From Swiss-Prot:
InterPro entries: Elong-fact-P_C, NA-bd_OB-fold, Rib_uL2_dom2, Transl_elong_fac_P/YeiP, Transl_elong_KOW-like, Transl_elong_P/YeiP_cen, Transl_elong_P/YeiP_CS, Transl_elongation_fac_P
Principal location: cytoplasm
Protein biosynthesis in keyword set: yes
Protein's pathway: Protein biosynthesis; polypeptide chain elongation
Gene name for this UniProt entry: efp
Gene Ontology molecular function: translation elongation factor activity
Protein name: Elongation factor P
PANTHER family registered for this protein in UniProt: ELONGATION FACTOR P, ELONGATION FACTOR P (EF-P) FAMILY PROTEIN
Family, similarity comment: Belongs to the elongation factor P family.
Length: 185
């Protein structure tokens, strides 16, 4: 159990049979009446965001999430196969479970798999990945009217905006949270 006074961004709670992550919270102490905590909660499974108000000191069950480091070994048909780095057990995840993070998954990459009981909630990628550019238009000297960037497709199939000087075959670092170019490797 966790008190509503201990809510912080990132704390996971169980509410209405689902896992919710606290995105924002505000402790409000009005001049008249009792204090309360206004929160913005995100459903980890569906991504829905709700606003919920709790009385100050109200206790709710804290979700016990298990985070395991696993390595993406290969793709079998539609499924993604991961290997636990400690027990060497394999886990198969569907494209729906992996979500849009699949565009940066590369064989041999280590990721964190977050589980609630036996249910996989999310796949956490590293904050940045290094991938090779496989397709991009050549940068023409003096062509900066478009802001100095162009689209590039990396080895996993993801499209990222890169500076004009990047060419095919170069390895670049990409921020997986914002889908932005960080630099050359």
């Amino acid at each position: 159990m966790i008190s509503s006074n201990d809510f912080r961004p990132g704390v996971s709670i169980e509410l209405d049979g689902a896992v919710w992550r606290v995105v924002e919270f505000l402790h409000v102490k009005p001049g008249k009446g009792s204090a309360f905590v206004r929160t913005k909660l995100k459903n980890v499974q569906t991504g829905n965001v709700i606003e919920r108000t709790f009385r100050a000191g109200e206790t709710v069950p804290q979700a016990t999430l298990e985070k395991r480091t696993m390595q993406h070994t290969y793709k079998d048909g539609e499924d993604y196969v991961f290997m636990d780095m400690e027990s060497y057990e394999e886990a198969r995840l569907t494209p729906a479970q992996v979500g849009d993070r699949a565009k940066y998954l590369k064989e041999g990459m280590e990721v964190n798999i977050v589980k609630w009981g036996e249910q996989v909630l999310e796949v956490e990628l590293p904050n940045s990945v290094v991938l090779e550019v496989v397709q991009t238009d050549p940068g023409v000297k003096g062509d900066t009217a478009t802001g100095g960037s162009k689209p590039a497709i990396v080895e996993t199939g993801a499209q990222v905006m890169v500076p004009l000087f990047i060419s095919v075959g170069e390895r670049i670092r990409i921020d997986t949270r914002s889908d932005t170019y960080l630099g050359r490797e």
